[in-house]
């Protein structure tokens, strides 16, 4: 079997500066995910970092608005000092302070993802001794980020098994490219994290499809649902069309919730100009069927998002159909901040990923 290993510690350099250990991170190979993970880890460990060449290999390198919102959110909740926190910056220095619970409001000012900002601040806030409430404004259904529905139905229930209690409520959807969605979140103190295992998803219980529309013809959602219904032989009772509260701009998202005995996955498709409703549904169906055709418990998008909470808990394991680049880079970065090892090995049930202190 092929194996992979993100050793503890991974490659990094430390420099003593103003009595604080600073980790040097090469940001050229990763995207915003690398930055968000570094911000979370820095606040959780009290270790500062300097990230250089941020998103250097992207068509628009440097910090974009949603990345800057994540930096500013982390700075605010953690009373941190930053150098280079501005649009387009390719180098950032982040020196964490004391994380304080409370009520916070953050806005990306565009369709930049509100859910990615939420995932940045969740870990340090659940380590506080009092609850926090958040109001996040921006994109809630963005093709390059977890949807608000994925957060509510897949990500947070997975965290619950690790011992983390958080919830979200969607006040107003924010579709790409206009954004302007509003998402509320509450985070409770996590008094004891558990070593959770996501190895067997159990028996299939249900599949349901939801078409979300704002400012668009209902016929678009009807065609999407008809296509998904045919691909998965779904009854009419499993197909739901929702015209949601008007957002800042028109939009369409297509959701497929696949519930098994031990785990629920949420797949999200996004309507876009020039792509037919049928093609939106077919692409979503292909993604879901690829996961259903495996014996792995966790689908690709959730897999790299489980590493950080499992590392903070000191251990955990899951199976997933593939090892993504995001998972590899997340594993390497976590090893720079925390005394954990992350190993993956190919098995008949897919890749088994193990986090151990």
Can you say where each PLM-predicted feature lies in the sequence?
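Conserved mixed alpha/beta catalytic, RNA-binding, or beta-rich assembly cores of soluble enzyme
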Residues: 144, 161, 200-300
